[in-house]
Design a protein with these regions (language model features):
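Structured binding/interaction patches within domain cores
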Residues: 1-150
């Protein structure tokens, strides 16, 4: 993680009711970033429910139920049998969405970066740490634009 992204995320800690909405707005952006990598229909349904929640006037605290459901699905993910690591992107994307829906932006950002890099092939994730930089920059820009921190 870049120092800039780390600094931005630290502004959303500790988790409070006052920063719940910005944490969840960034979380939704994280979900949408990796949504194309998701495999499990129930996780995809959770993302849609999360999107609906964020667009409605419902109590945002309902996100915890979605987060718990997505976490259970992530923990039960069968993983990947592919040798190139691309299949691991679905696992990381599922964990990214679970963290995002649970209001944990730092963990969501970390999993988003892994999912996007794994989605390009496993080599970069294990052998080229710089392959994460474009994703970290994207996350920085999204966090700044969505929640106005920085």
């Amino acid at each position: 993680m870049t120092p800039e992204l780390d600094h931005l995320l630290s502004q959303l800690s500790p988790a409070t009711l006052e920063n719940l909405e910005p944490r969840l707005r960034f979380g939704l952006s994280c979900c949408e970033r990796v949504e194309h990598l998701l495999e499990h229909p129930e996780v995809i349904s959770c993302v849609q429910s999360f999107r609906d929640l964020m667009q409605s006037s419902k109590a945002l605290e309902e996100h915890m139920e979605l987060g718990a459901r997505a976490t259970a699905l992530a923990n039960g993910h069968h993983g990947s049998r592919s040798l190139d690591g691309v299949g691991h992107a679905a696992v990381s994307a599922t964990y990214a969405c679970a963290a995002a829906m649970s209001g944990r932006p730092r963990q969501a950002a970390e999993y988003v970066a892994y999912a996007m890099v794994y989605g390009q092939g496993g080599y970069g994730a294990t052998q080229e740490p710089d392959s994460f930089l474009p994703e970290y920059r994207w996350l920085e820009q999204r966090l700044q634009s969505l929640v106005g921190v920085g």
